[in-house]
Amino acid sequence: MSISSLHRGYQVLRTLLHYGLDELLAKDKRPKLFPLIRGCFFWIRNQHKDKSAAERLKLAMQELGPVYIKLGQMLSTRRDLLDDEWAYQLAMLQDRVPPFDSALAREAIETELNASIDSLFDDFDDVPLASASIAQVHSATLKSNGKAVVLKVLRPNVEALILADLQLMSHCAALLERILGDGNRLRPAEVIEDYRLTILGELNLKLEALNAIKLRNNFLDSDALYVPYIYEDLSFTRLIVMERIYGIAVSDLSALKAQGTNLKLLAERGVELFFTQVFRDNFFHADMHPGNIFISRDHPDNPYYIGLDCGIMGTLTDVDKRYLAENFLAFFNRDYQRIAQLHLESGWVSEHTDIVAFEQAIKIVCEPMFNKPLAEISFGHVLLALFRTARQFNMVVQPQLVLLQKTLLYIEGLGRQLYPQLDLWQTAKPFLEQWMAKQVGPKALFDKFKSNAPFWAEKLPELPELVYDNLKLGRKLLGTQQQMLDKYLKYQHKAHKSNYLLITSAVFVICGTILFTQAVTLWASLLCLGTGAGLWLLGWQARPKNRKL
Protein backbone atom coordinates (compact mmCIF):
# COMPACT_ATOMS: atom_id res chain seq x y z
CA MET A 1 0.00 0.00 0.00
CA SER A 2 1.40 3.41 -0.99
CA ILE A 3 2.08 6.35 1.34
CA SER A 4 -0.81 8.28 -0.24
CA SER A 5 -3.18 5.35 0.38
CA LEU A 6 -2.11 5.17 4.03
CA HIS A 7 -2.60 8.92 4.38
CA ARG A 8 -6.06 8.71 2.82
CA GLY A 9 -6.90 5.80 5.11
CA TYR A 10 -5.94 7.90 8.12
CA GLN A 11 -8.10 10.81 6.85
CA VAL A 12 -11.10 8.51 6.54
CA LEU A 13 -10.52 6.96 9.98
CA ARG A 14 -10.08 10.38 11.61
CA THR A 15 -13.33 11.62 10.05
CA LEU A 16 -15.27 8.53 11.13
CA LEU A 17 -14.03 8.91 14.72
CA HIS A 18 -14.60 12.69 14.70
CA TYR A 19 -18.29 12.08 13.93
CA GLY A 20 -18.56 9.12 16.30
CA LEU A 21 -19.45 6.63 13.59
CA ASP A 22 -17.50 3.91 15.41
CA GLU A 23 -20.25 4.04 18.03
CA LEU A 24 -22.76 2.75 15.49
CA LEU A 25 -21.35 -0.77 15.88
CA ALA A 26 -23.08 -2.66 18.68
CA LYS A 27 -20.65 -3.66 21.45
CA ASP A 28 -21.17 -7.36 20.80
CA LYS A 29 -20.25 -6.83 17.14
CA ARG A 30 -16.99 -4.97 17.78
CA PRO A 31 -13.73 -6.87 17.09
CA LYS A 32 -11.61 -7.85 20.09
CA LEU A 33 -8.87 -5.42 19.04
CA PHE A 34 -11.38 -2.56 18.70
CA PRO A 35 -10.73 -0.96 22.13
CA LEU A 36 -6.95 -1.05 21.47
CA ILE A 37 -7.34 0.55 18.03
CA ARG A 38 -9.73 3.16 19.46
CA GLY A 39 -7.26 3.88 22.26
CA CYS A 40 -4.47 4.57 19.76
CA PHE A 41 -6.48 7.58 18.56
CA PHE A 42 -7.63 8.74 22.00
CA TRP A 43 -7.33 12.41 21.04
CA ILE A 44 -10.03 12.10 18.34
CA ARG A 45 -13.40 12.27 20.08
CA ASN A 46 -16.98 12.42 18.87
CA GLN A 47 -17.59 16.15 18.46
CA HIS A 48 -21.23 15.80 17.36
CA LYS A 49 -22.97 13.86 20.13
CA ASP A 50 -25.96 16.20 19.89
CA LYS A 51 -26.76 15.00 16.35
CA SER A 52 -28.49 11.80 15.25
CA ALA A 53 -26.44 8.93 13.84
CA ALA A 54 -27.91 9.45 10.37
CA GLU A 55 -27.03 13.15 10.39
CA ARG A 56 -23.47 12.38 11.57
CA LEU A 57 -23.04 9.94 8.67
CA LYS A 58 -24.21 12.60 6.21
CA LEU A 59 -21.76 15.18 7.61
CA ALA A 60 -18.88 12.69 7.51
CA MET A 61 -19.53 11.83 3.86
CA GLN A 62 -19.79 15.51 2.98
CA GLU A 63 -16.38 16.11 4.58
CA LEU A 64 -14.73 13.09 2.91
CA GLY A 65 -15.41 14.49 -0.53
CA PRO A 66 -16.98 13.70 -3.90
CA VAL A 67 -16.59 9.91 -4.01
CA TYR A 68 -18.21 9.52 -0.61
CA ILE A 69 -20.87 12.11 -1.43
CA LYS A 70 -21.88 10.11 -4.49
CA LEU A 71 -21.88 6.92 -2.42
CA GLY A 72 -24.21 8.60 0.06
CA GLN A 73 -26.50 9.76 -2.74
CA MET A 74 -26.65 6.22 -4.10
CA LEU A 75 -27.34 4.79 -0.64
CA SER A 76 -30.21 7.24 -0.21
CA THR A 77 -31.99 5.48 -3.08
CA ARG A 78 -31.46 2.01 -1.55
CA ARG A 79 -34.53 2.15 0.67
CA ASP A 80 -34.64 -1.62 0.58
CA LEU A 81 -31.51 -1.42 2.77
CA LEU A 82 -31.88 1.78 4.80
CA ASP A 83 -34.57 3.10 7.10
CA ASP A 84 -36.34 6.30 6.07
CA GLU A 85 -34.39 8.62 8.42
CA TRP A 86 -31.03 7.48 7.03
CA ALA A 87 -32.24 7.71 3.42
CA TYR A 88 -33.64 11.20 4.04
CA GLN A 89 -30.39 12.52 5.52
CA LEU A 90 -28.19 11.05 2.77
CA ALA A 91 -30.50 12.43 0.06
CA MET A 92 -29.51 15.94 1.22
CA LEU A 93 -25.87 15.44 0.17
CA GLN A 94 -24.94 17.88 -2.59
CA ASP A 95 -22.40 17.06 -5.30
CA ARG A 96 -21.08 20.60 -5.57
CA VAL A 97 -17.36 21.32 -5.62
CA PRO A 98 -15.34 24.37 -6.64
CA PRO A 99 -14.41 24.45 -10.35
CA PHE A 100 -10.89 23.51 -11.35
CA ASP A 101 -8.60 25.92 -13.19
CA SER A 102 -9.85 26.85 -16.67
CA ALA A 103 -6.28 26.47 -17.99
CA LEU A 104 -6.40 22.80 -16.97
CA ALA A 105 -9.84 22.49 -18.58
CA ARG A 106 -8.50 23.95 -21.84
CA GLU A 107 -5.52 21.60 -21.77
CA ALA A 108 -7.72 18.54 -21.17
CA ILE A 109 -10.13 19.53 -23.97
CA GLU A 110 -7.35 20.17 -26.49
CA THR A 111 -5.67 16.87 -25.59
CA GLU A 112 -8.88 14.98 -26.37
CA LEU A 113 -9.61 16.91 -29.57
CA ASN A 114 -5.97 16.88 -30.71
CA ALA A 115 -6.59 20.46 -31.82
CA SER A 116 -6.69 23.92 -30.30
CA ILE A 117 -9.97 25.18 -28.88
CA ASP A 118 -9.75 28.36 -30.97
CA SER A 119 -9.57 26.32 -34.18
CA LEU A 120 -12.91 24.61 -33.48
CA PHE A 121 -14.86 26.97 -31.22
CA ASP A 122 -15.71 30.63 -30.82
CA ASP A 123 -16.66 32.31 -27.56
CA PHE A 124 -15.29 29.56 -25.31
CA ASP A 125 -16.25 30.62 -21.77
CA ASP A 126 -13.54 29.96 -19.18
CA VAL A 127 -16.12 30.33 -16.41
CA PRO A 128 -17.90 26.95 -16.17
CA LEU A 129 -21.68 26.70 -16.34
CA ALA A 130 -21.57 23.93 -13.73
CA SER A 131 -18.98 22.06 -11.69
CA ALA A 132 -19.36 18.66 -10.04
CA SER A 133 -17.12 16.00 -8.54
CA ILE A 134 -16.39 14.18 -11.81
CA ALA A 135 -16.66 16.81 -14.54
CA GLN A 136 -17.41 20.42 -15.29
CA VAL A 137 -19.22 22.11 -18.17
CA HIS A 138 -18.15 25.05 -20.37
CA SER A 139 -20.11 26.83 -23.08
CA ALA A 140 -18.89 27.73 -26.58
CA THR A 141 -20.01 28.20 -30.19
CA LEU A 142 -19.05 25.80 -32.98
CA LYS A 143 -17.12 27.46 -35.79
CA SER A 144 -18.45 24.96 -38.35
CA ASN A 145 -22.15 25.83 -38.00
CA GLY A 146 -22.38 28.71 -35.52
CA LYS A 147 -24.48 26.69 -33.07
CA ALA A 148 -24.23 27.01 -29.30
CA VAL A 149 -22.74 23.96 -27.59
CA VAL A 150 -21.55 22.83 -24.19
CA LEU A 151 -18.36 20.89 -23.48
CA LYS A 152 -18.36 18.48 -20.56
CA VAL A 153 -14.82 17.54 -19.51
CA LEU A 154 -13.57 15.21 -16.78
CA ARG A 155 -11.55 16.61 -13.90
CA PRO A 156 -7.78 16.03 -14.08
CA ASN A 157 -6.65 12.77 -12.42
CA VAL A 158 -10.21 12.05 -11.28
CA GLU A 159 -9.90 8.37 -12.28
CA ALA A 160 -6.89 7.75 -10.02
CA LEU A 161 -8.55 9.49 -7.07
CA ILE A 162 -11.77 7.52 -7.49
CA LEU A 163 -9.98 4.18 -7.91
CA ALA A 164 -7.93 4.81 -4.76
CA ASP A 165 -11.04 5.61 -2.72
CA LEU A 166 -12.90 2.63 -4.19
CA GLN A 167 -10.08 0.29 -3.17
CA LEU A 168 -10.17 1.65 0.37
CA MET A 169 -13.98 1.32 0.44
CA SER A 170 -13.77 -2.30 -0.70
CA HIS A 171 -11.32 -3.18 2.11
CA CYS A 172 -13.53 -1.45 4.68
CA ALA A 173 -16.67 -3.15 3.34
CA ALA A 174 -15.05 -6.59 3.49
CA LEU A 175 -13.93 -5.94 7.08
CA LEU A 176 -17.36 -4.63 8.07
CA GLU A 177 -19.08 -7.64 6.51
CA ARG A 178 -16.90 -10.02 8.53
CA ILE A 179 -17.73 -8.09 11.69
CA LEU A 180 -21.47 -7.94 11.06
CA GLY A 181 -21.83 -11.50 9.75
CA ASP A 182 -23.74 -12.97 6.82
CA GLY A 183 -27.15 -12.14 8.22
CA ASN A 184 -26.62 -8.38 8.10
CA ARG A 185 -29.21 -6.55 6.01
CA LEU A 186 -26.88 -3.81 4.72
CA ARG A 187 -24.46 -6.17 2.88
CA PRO A 188 -21.59 -3.64 2.57
CA ALA A 189 -19.54 -5.50 -0.06
CA GLU A 190 -22.56 -5.76 -2.35
CA VAL A 191 -23.32 -2.04 -1.97
CA ILE A 192 -19.74 -1.00 -2.75
CA GLU A 193 -19.57 -3.28 -5.81
CA ASP A 194 -22.84 -1.78 -7.11
CA TYR A 195 -21.43 1.71 -6.53
CA ARG A 196 -18.12 0.82 -8.21
CA LEU A 197 -19.87 -0.24 -11.42
CA THR A 198 -22.01 2.90 -11.40
CA ILE A 199 -19.25 5.44 -10.83
CA LEU A 200 -16.79 3.81 -13.25
CA GLY A 201 -19.50 4.01 -15.92
CA GLU A 202 -19.76 7.76 -15.30
CA LEU A 203 -16.02 8.16 -15.99
CA ASN A 204 -16.50 7.14 -19.64
CA LEU A 205 -18.02 10.13 -21.44
CA LYS A 206 -17.92 8.29 -24.77
CA LEU A 207 -20.36 5.77 -23.30
CA GLU A 208 -22.54 8.64 -22.07
CA ALA A 209 -22.52 10.10 -25.59
CA LEU A 210 -23.61 6.79 -27.13
CA ASN A 211 -26.36 6.43 -24.52
CA ALA A 212 -27.64 9.91 -25.31
CA ILE A 213 -27.64 9.19 -29.05
CA LYS A 214 -29.66 6.01 -28.51
CA LEU A 215 -32.18 7.72 -26.22
CA ARG A 216 -32.51 10.62 -28.68
CA ASN A 217 -33.20 8.20 -31.56
CA ASN A 218 -35.83 6.40 -29.48
CA PHE A 219 -37.76 9.67 -29.04
CA LEU A 220 -37.05 11.49 -32.30
CA ASP A 221 -40.76 11.72 -33.16
CA SER A 222 -41.92 12.28 -29.59
CA ASP A 223 -43.59 15.43 -28.34
CA ALA A 224 -42.85 14.39 -24.73
CA LEU A 225 -39.02 14.18 -24.56
CA TYR A 226 -36.15 15.97 -26.26
CA VAL A 227 -32.52 14.84 -25.93
CA PRO A 228 -29.83 17.34 -27.07
CA TYR A 229 -27.87 16.51 -30.21
CA ILE A 230 -24.47 14.91 -29.54
CA TYR A 231 -21.50 15.80 -31.74
CA GLU A 232 -20.12 12.28 -31.87
CA ASP A 233 -16.99 13.19 -33.83
CA LEU A 234 -16.05 15.64 -31.04
CA SER A 235 -16.83 13.28 -28.15
CA PHE A 236 -14.26 11.04 -26.48
CA THR A 237 -13.65 9.17 -23.22
CA ARG A 238 -12.90 12.37 -21.30
CA LEU A 239 -14.88 14.90 -23.35
CA ILE A 240 -18.40 15.20 -24.71
CA VAL A 241 -19.69 18.03 -26.93
CA MET A 242 -23.44 18.52 -27.24
CA GLU A 243 -26.08 21.00 -28.30
CA ARG A 244 -26.78 23.67 -25.71
CA ILE A 245 -30.38 23.75 -24.54
CA TYR A 246 -32.38 26.50 -22.85
CA GLY A 247 -35.12 25.37 -20.51
CA ILE A 248 -36.59 25.71 -17.06
CA ALA A 249 -35.36 23.43 -14.29
CA VAL A 250 -38.13 20.97 -13.46
CA SER A 251 -37.75 21.89 -9.78
CA ASP A 252 -38.50 25.58 -10.51
CA LEU A 253 -42.26 25.31 -10.04
CA SER A 254 -42.84 29.06 -9.80
CA ALA A 255 -41.20 29.67 -13.21
CA LEU A 256 -43.25 26.87 -14.77
CA LYS A 257 -46.45 28.34 -13.39
CA ALA A 258 -45.43 31.85 -14.46
CA GLN A 259 -45.18 30.80 -18.11
CA GLY A 260 -48.53 28.97 -17.92
CA THR A 261 -47.18 25.41 -18.26
CA ASN A 262 -49.83 22.68 -18.40
CA LEU A 263 -48.63 20.92 -15.25
CA LYS A 264 -51.24 18.12 -15.38
CA LEU A 265 -50.17 17.13 -18.90
CA LEU A 266 -46.50 17.45 -17.94
CA ALA A 267 -46.92 15.16 -14.91
CA GLU A 268 -48.81 12.52 -16.93
CA ARG A 269 -46.18 12.64 -19.67
CA GLY A 270 -43.46 11.99 -17.11
CA VAL A 271 -45.10 8.71 -16.06
CA GLU A 272 -45.79 7.76 -19.69
CA LEU A 273 -42.16 8.45 -20.61
CA PHE A 274 -40.92 6.16 -17.86
CA PHE A 275 -43.12 3.22 -18.86
CA THR A 276 -42.40 3.80 -22.56
CA GLN A 277 -38.66 3.62 -21.92
CA VAL A 278 -39.03 0.47 -19.81
CA PHE A 279 -41.60 -1.55 -21.75
CA ARG A 280 -41.22 -0.31 -25.33
CA ASP A 281 -37.51 0.45 -25.58
CA ASN A 282 -36.01 -1.53 -22.69
CA PHE A 283 -33.60 1.38 -22.20
CA PHE A 284 -34.37 3.92 -19.49
CA HIS A 285 -32.68 6.99 -18.05
CA ALA A 286 -31.72 5.95 -14.52
CA ASP A 287 -30.45 9.27 -13.16
CA MET A 288 -33.52 11.47 -13.51
CA HIS A 289 -32.96 13.76 -10.54
CA PRO A 290 -34.09 17.41 -10.93
CA GLY A 291 -30.62 18.61 -12.02
CA ASN A 292 -30.81 16.46 -15.16
CA ILE A 293 -34.36 17.34 -16.23
CA PHE A 294 -35.51 20.60 -17.81
CA ILE A 295 -38.82 21.75 -19.29
CA SER A 296 -39.23 23.48 -22.65
CA ARG A 297 -39.85 27.23 -22.71
CA ASP A 298 -41.84 27.12 -25.93
CA HIS A 299 -45.44 25.82 -26.17
CA PRO A 300 -46.22 25.84 -22.42
CA ASP A 301 -49.67 24.43 -23.23
CA ASN A 302 -47.96 21.39 -24.81
CA PRO A 303 -44.74 21.10 -22.75
CA TYR A 304 -42.01 18.53 -23.20
CA TYR A 305 -39.11 17.29 -21.09
CA ILE A 306 -35.44 17.85 -21.92
CA GLY A 307 -33.20 15.04 -20.68
CA LEU A 308 -29.51 15.49 -19.87
CA ASP A 309 -26.67 13.35 -18.48
CA CYS A 310 -27.15 9.83 -19.83
CA GLY A 311 -24.23 8.37 -17.91
CA ILE A 312 -26.43 5.91 -16.01
CA MET A 313 -28.94 3.95 -18.09
CA GLY A 314 -30.91 0.85 -17.19
CA THR A 315 -32.07 -2.20 -19.14
CA LEU A 316 -34.30 -5.11 -18.16
CA THR A 317 -34.62 -8.68 -19.36
CA ASP A 318 -38.00 -10.05 -20.46
CA VAL A 319 -38.15 -11.86 -17.10
CA ASP A 320 -37.60 -8.53 -15.30
CA LYS A 321 -40.31 -6.78 -17.32
CA ARG A 322 -42.78 -9.59 -16.77
CA TYR A 323 -41.97 -9.54 -13.06
CA LEU A 324 -42.59 -5.79 -12.94
CA ALA A 325 -45.84 -5.81 -14.93
CA GLU A 326 -47.34 -8.88 -13.25
CA ASN A 327 -46.36 -7.69 -9.78
CA PHE A 328 -48.10 -4.36 -10.23
CA LEU A 329 -51.21 -5.97 -11.71
CA ALA A 330 -51.28 -8.64 -8.98
CA PHE A 331 -50.78 -5.97 -6.30
CA PHE A 332 -53.72 -3.87 -7.47
CA ASN A 333 -55.80 -7.08 -7.65
CA ARG A 334 -54.60 -7.96 -4.13
CA ASP A 335 -53.35 -11.32 -5.41
CA TYR A 336 -50.51 -11.82 -2.93
CA GLN A 337 -50.16 -15.51 -3.73
CA ARG A 338 -49.33 -14.61 -7.34
CA ILE A 339 -46.72 -12.08 -6.16
CA ALA A 340 -45.03 -14.76 -4.05
CA GLN A 341 -45.12 -17.23 -6.95
CA LEU A 342 -43.56 -14.63 -9.29
CA HIS A 343 -40.54 -14.31 -7.03
CA LEU A 344 -40.21 -18.09 -6.96
CA GLU A 345 -40.64 -18.49 -10.75
CA SER A 346 -38.02 -15.81 -11.39
CA GLY A 347 -35.51 -17.73 -9.29
CA TRP A 348 -34.95 -14.74 -7.00
CA VAL A 349 -35.94 -16.63 -3.87
CA SER A 350 -35.01 -20.23 -3.16
CA GLU A 351 -37.33 -23.02 -4.27
CA HIS A 352 -37.23 -24.17 -0.63
CA THR A 353 -38.87 -20.92 0.52
CA ASP A 354 -42.05 -21.36 2.56
CA ILE A 355 -44.42 -19.89 -0.04
CA VAL A 356 -47.32 -19.57 2.44
CA ALA A 357 -45.18 -17.63 4.94
CA PHE A 358 -43.82 -15.48 2.09
CA GLU A 359 -47.36 -14.71 0.87
CA GLN A 360 -48.46 -13.75 4.38
CA ALA A 361 -45.44 -11.46 4.81
CA ILE A 362 -46.28 -9.70 1.52
CA LYS A 363 -49.91 -9.33 2.56
CA ILE A 364 -49.00 -7.84 5.94
CA VAL A 365 -46.85 -5.19 4.22
CA CYS A 366 -49.05 -4.41 1.20
CA GLU A 367 -52.61 -4.63 2.53
CA PRO A 368 -52.43 -1.42 4.65
CA MET A 369 -51.59 0.53 1.46
CA PHE A 370 -55.20 0.06 0.34
CA ASN A 371 -56.40 2.24 3.21
CA LYS A 372 -55.79 5.17 0.84
CA PRO A 373 -57.34 5.77 -2.62
CA LEU A 374 -55.70 3.98 -5.58
CA ALA A 375 -54.65 7.33 -7.04
CA GLU A 376 -52.45 8.00 -4.00
CA ILE A 377 -50.62 4.65 -3.97
CA SER A 378 -46.95 4.92 -4.91
CA PHE A 379 -45.57 2.42 -7.42
CA GLY A 380 -42.08 3.02 -6.08
CA HIS A 381 -43.14 2.26 -2.53
CA VAL A 382 -44.94 -0.89 -3.69
CA LEU A 383 -41.68 -2.13 -5.24
CA LEU A 384 -39.77 -1.04 -2.16
CA ALA A 385 -42.12 -2.97 0.12
CA LEU A 386 -41.74 -6.08 -2.04
CA PHE A 387 -37.93 -5.79 -2.08
CA ARG A 388 -37.73 -5.39 1.69
CA THR A 389 -40.05 -8.34 2.30
CA ALA A 390 -38.27 -10.55 -0.24
CA ARG A 391 -34.88 -9.79 1.32
CA GLN A 392 -36.17 -11.28 4.59
CA PHE A 393 -36.53 -14.50 2.59
CA ASN A 394 -32.99 -14.13 1.15
CA MET A 395 -33.96 -12.74 -2.24
CA VAL A 396 -31.02 -12.48 -4.61
CA VAL A 397 -30.37 -8.77 -5.19
CA GLN A 398 -31.34 -7.57 -8.68
CA PRO A 399 -29.31 -4.37 -9.35
CA GLN A 400 -31.32 -3.54 -12.47
CA LEU A 401 -34.58 -3.57 -10.48
CA VAL A 402 -33.05 -1.47 -7.70
CA LEU A 403 -32.03 1.04 -10.39
CA LEU A 404 -35.55 0.99 -11.80
CA GLN A 405 -37.16 1.40 -8.38
CA LYS A 406 -34.94 4.43 -7.69
CA THR A 407 -35.95 5.97 -11.03
CA LEU A 408 -39.62 5.23 -10.39
CA LEU A 409 -39.44 7.04 -7.04
CA TYR A 410 -37.89 10.05 -8.80
CA ILE A 411 -40.62 10.06 -11.47
CA GLU A 412 -43.44 9.73 -8.94
CA GLY A 413 -42.04 12.45 -6.72
CA LEU A 414 -41.58 14.71 -9.72
CA GLY A 415 -45.08 13.99 -11.07
CA ARG A 416 -46.82 14.69 -7.78
CA GLN A 417 -44.73 17.81 -7.24
CA LEU A 418 -45.96 19.13 -10.59
CA TYR A 419 -49.55 17.94 -10.17
CA PRO A 420 -50.50 16.57 -6.70
CA GLN A 421 -53.71 14.95 -8.04
CA LEU A 422 -51.78 12.77 -10.49
CA ASP A 423 -53.36 9.27 -10.72
CA LEU A 424 -50.37 7.04 -11.34
CA TRP A 425 -52.42 3.85 -11.62
CA GLN A 426 -54.73 5.16 -14.35
CA THR A 427 -51.77 6.57 -16.27
CA ALA A 428 -49.67 3.40 -16.04
CA LYS A 429 -52.34 0.69 -16.27
CA PRO A 430 -52.71 0.80 -20.10
CA PHE A 431 -48.94 0.30 -20.56
CA LEU A 432 -48.90 -2.70 -18.23
CA GLU A 433 -51.98 -4.36 -19.74
CA GLN A 434 -50.85 -3.77 -23.33
CA TRP A 435 -47.42 -5.22 -22.63
CA MET A 436 -48.88 -8.28 -20.87
CA ALA A 437 -51.30 -8.84 -23.77
CA LYS A 438 -48.37 -8.81 -26.19
CA GLN A 439 -46.49 -11.35 -24.07
CA VAL A 440 -49.22 -14.00 -23.84
CA GLY A 441 -51.32 -13.52 -26.99
CA PRO A 442 -51.14 -15.29 -30.40
CA LYS A 443 -48.98 -12.49 -31.78
CA ALA A 444 -46.42 -13.09 -29.02
CA LEU A 445 -46.33 -16.78 -29.91
CA PHE A 446 -45.82 -15.97 -33.59
CA ASP A 447 -43.11 -13.39 -32.79
CA LYS A 448 -41.20 -15.92 -30.67
CA PHE A 449 -41.45 -18.49 -33.45
CA LYS A 450 -40.23 -15.89 -35.95
CA SER A 451 -37.29 -14.87 -33.75
CA ASN A 452 -36.26 -18.54 -33.38
CA ALA A 453 -36.74 -19.33 -37.08
CA PRO A 454 -33.11 -18.57 -38.11
CA PHE A 455 -31.82 -20.96 -35.44
CA TRP A 456 -34.09 -23.80 -36.60
CA ALA A 457 -33.35 -23.07 -40.26
CA GLU A 458 -29.65 -23.50 -39.47
CA LYS A 459 -30.24 -26.75 -37.56
CA LEU A 460 -32.74 -28.30 -40.02
CA PRO A 461 -30.11 -29.85 -42.39
CA GLU A 462 -28.53 -31.56 -39.37
CA LEU A 463 -31.84 -33.10 -38.26
CA PRO A 464 -31.57 -36.48 -40.15
CA GLU A 465 -28.04 -37.01 -38.86
CA LEU A 466 -29.12 -36.13 -35.32
CA VAL A 467 -32.05 -38.60 -35.55
CA TYR A 468 -29.75 -41.35 -36.89
CA ASP A 469 -27.15 -40.71 -34.17
CA ASN A 470 -29.81 -40.84 -31.46
CA LEU A 471 -31.28 -44.11 -32.82
CA LYS A 472 -27.79 -45.61 -33.01
CA LEU A 473 -27.06 -44.48 -29.49
CA GLY A 474 -30.41 -45.88 -28.35
CA ARG A 475 -29.63 -49.31 -29.82
CA LYS A 476 -26.21 -49.26 -28.22
CA LEU A 477 -27.68 -48.33 -24.86
CA LEU A 478 -30.31 -51.07 -25.22
CA GLY A 479 -27.58 -53.66 -25.89
CA THR A 480 -25.56 -52.40 -22.96
CA GLN A 481 -28.60 -52.53 -20.69
CA GLN A 482 -29.32 -56.16 -21.79
CA GLN A 483 -25.72 -57.14 -21.00
CA MET A 484 -25.96 -55.49 -17.60
CA LEU A 485 -29.26 -57.26 -16.93
CA ASP A 486 -27.75 -60.66 -17.86
CA LYS A 487 -24.80 -60.02 -15.57
CA TYR A 488 -27.12 -58.97 -12.78
CA LEU A 489 -29.32 -62.10 -13.13
CA LYS A 490 -26.23 -64.36 -13.19
CA TYR A 491 -24.90 -62.62 -10.12
CA GLN A 492 -28.23 -63.01 -8.32
CA HIS A 493 -28.42 -66.72 -9.23
CA LYS A 494 -24.94 -67.40 -7.82
CA ALA A 495 -25.67 -65.35 -4.74
CA HIS A 496 -28.90 -67.25 -4.03
CA LYS A 497 -27.15 -70.63 -4.53
CA SER A 498 -24.29 -69.63 -2.24
CA ASN A 499 -26.65 -68.34 0.46
CA TYR A 500 -28.73 -71.55 0.27
CA LEU A 501 -25.65 -73.78 0.75
CA LEU A 502 -24.26 -71.63 3.57
CA ILE A 503 -27.58 -71.59 5.43
CA THR A 504 -27.99 -75.37 5.00
CA SER A 505 -24.43 -75.94 6.24
CA ALA A 506 -25.21 -73.87 9.30
CA VAL A 507 -28.25 -76.05 10.02
CA PHE A 508 -26.15 -79.26 9.81
CA VAL A 509 -23.43 -77.79 12.04
CA ILE A 510 -26.01 -76.76 14.66
CA CYS A 511 -27.65 -80.20 14.55
CA GLY A 512 -24.25 -81.96 14.86
CA THR A 513 -23.35 -79.77 17.83
CA ILE A 514 -26.65 -80.52 19.58
CA LEU A 515 -26.25 -84.28 18.99
CA PHE A 516 -22.69 -84.14 20.36
CA THR A 517 -23.70 -82.27 23.52
CA GLN A 518 -26.67 -84.57 24.16
CA ALA A 519 -24.32 -87.66 24.11
CA VAL A 520 -26.23 -89.21 21.23
CA THR A 521 -24.47 -91.64 18.87
CA LEU A 522 -21.08 -90.16 17.98
CA TRP A 523 -21.21 -91.19 14.34
CA ALA A 524 -24.48 -89.24 13.77
CA SER A 525 -22.93 -86.13 15.28
CA LEU A 526 -19.78 -86.42 13.16
CA LEU A 527 -21.88 -87.06 10.03
CA CYS A 528 -23.85 -83.85 10.56
CA LEU A 529 -20.72 -81.81 11.28
CA GLY A 530 -18.93 -83.25 8.23
CA THR A 531 -21.92 -82.62 5.98
CA GLY A 532 -22.17 -79.05 7.31
CA ALA A 533 -18.46 -78.43 6.67
CA GLY A 534 -18.77 -79.80 3.13
CA LEU A 535 -21.81 -77.67 2.34
CA TRP A 536 -20.10 -74.57 3.78
CA LEU A 537 -17.10 -75.20 1.50
CA LEU A 538 -19.38 -75.57 -1.55
CA GLY A 539 -21.32 -72.43 -0.60
CA TRP A 540 -18.13 -70.41 -0.14
CA GLN A 541 -16.84 -71.53 -3.55
CA ALA A 542 -20.21 -70.73 -5.17
CA ARG A 543 -20.06 -67.05 -4.11
CA PRO A 544 -20.12 -64.53 -7.04
CA LYS A 545 -16.50 -63.65 -7.74
CA ASN A 546 -17.18 -60.18 -9.24
CA ARG A 547 -19.41 -57.90 -7.18
CA LYS A 548 -19.00 -55.02 -9.67
CA LEU A 549 -21.65 -54.88 -12.40
UniProtKB/Swiss-Prot annotation:
Any Pfam family hit: ABC1
Span of domain Protein kinase: 123-501
Pathway note: Cofactor biosynthesis; ubiquinone biosynthesis [regulation]
Membrane topology: Multi-pass membrane protein
GO molecular function: ATP binding; protein kinase activity
Record-level GO BP terms: regulation of ubiquinone biosynthetic process; ubiquinone biosynthetic process
Residues annotated for ATP binding in this entry: 129-137, 152
Active site: 287 (proton acceptor)
One Gene Ontology CC term in the entry: plasma membrane
Transmembrane segment boundaries: 498-517, 521-540
Enzyme class at the top of the EC tree: transferase
InterPro entries: ABC1_dom, Kinase-like_dom_sf, UbiB, UbiB_bact, UbiB_kinase
Source organism, top-level taxon: Bacteria
Record-listed E.C. numbers: 2.7.-.-
Chief location bin: membrane
Subcellular location: Cell inner membrane
Entry keyword set: ATP-binding, Cell inner membrane, Cell membrane, Kinase, Membrane, Nucleotide-binding, Transferase, Transmembrane, Transmembrane helix, Ubiquinone biosynthesis
Function text: Is probably a protein kinase regulator of UbiI activity which is involved in aerobic coenzyme Q (ubiquinone) biosynthesis.
Family (UniProt): Belongs to the ABC1 family. UbiB subfamily.
Protein name, per record: Probable protein kinase UbiB
